[in-house]
Amino acid sequence: MVATGGTFDELHIGHLALLTKAFEFGDKVIIGISSDEFASRVKNKKILRHNYEERVKNLRDMIEKRFGHVNYTIAKLDNEFGPTVTYGLVDALVASSETACKGEEINDIRRTNRMKPISIVAVDILKAEDGGPISSTRIRSGEIDASGKILSRTTKSE
């Protein structure tokens, strides 16, 4: 069983890459989605466009459209570790290269709880046309679209 997670506010091709790797790597996937409360405590997530229920629905719609009928469960995340530290059947974590470092913390907690360590699979952060990361934050701010296309350019005033 594979776990992955995120806030999944403005869905984009980076989320698609993460989910693609998770579904390639495991027969069953647990997808953690940050609760509204947890997301509001995380840097750059204070202003979400969608509440938890909307984010779940949007993600389910994307999964059905892109992957068809795959075996997955959605878990509400109230902390950064979610079911990876409590559910013994998780074998692997698929995470962005930005968050894969949490895998070692997860494995430390799992060892303390006498659970076997999990494999960590890192997915590279996808870059927008300008070379910056594709992220929900940049989509919310109107800089880029979900595929990384530049929507606005800031100009320096002289």
Residue ranges and their predicted role:
Residues 1-158:
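Nucleotidyltransferase catalytic core that binds NTPs
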